[in-house]
Amino acid sequence: MGNYLNQDGKKFYEITHSDIYVDKTELLTYTNSVLQTLQKYICISRPRRFGKSITASMIAAYYSRGCDAKELFSPYKIARNLDFDTYRNKYNTLFLNMQEFLSRTKNIYELLDRMKRLVLRDLKREYPNVDYFDDTDLIESMQDVYQETNCPFVVIIDEWDCIFREYKQDKEAQEIYLDFLRDMLKDKSCIALAYMTGILPIKKYGTHSALNMFDEFSMINPGPLASYVGFTELEVAAQIGRASCRERVS
């Protein structure tokens, strides 16, 4: 268990034990269906406060080898799925909130360097006996771990597009960041699933060709994920009807 690699599921525990939680765990039936396929690249584009980070934490808790989430998920819909145990907590799961790295660094070089060093520390702590070709290279080290363990990675990148909002006019910084994402994720057999969240669709940043392996799901085109992201009218009505919620409204 690390800070970024194979987290312990406590974030999702806190979410599910809060006053309001709407069960969106059936999204995992979709992510399970695309694991290690060409459809394994998913980008969710929604405005703020639409539960993107909550869903990302749910995915991390379900796949992470850093915890046993059977009891945590047992009250929810995904637990009734026949494949619930097949994929649960079986993957090296990397959770990156890019806003966290952005707020602690001054430029894109510092951001990527800090992120790589922190993830590499987690990786080497979890797999100290792997024969790393270059233990300062994150992408190669992930491939080395996969080759020796046959355990692929689920990579979750929350707020992937915050770099574009911070460096609006810095095309070089944007290209460096995109090059990193492409090199890390594209055509890599060690990646079982890549799940990114952002505010605007990839094409809005003029970068669609660099990340053209991703399927995008937005408010306008939610596709098969329509009922899993955001809230339906019935879900909103059910929450308003709860006593704790009525007290807040009044």
Predicted regions and their residues:
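Phosphate-binding site recognition
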Residues: M1-R248
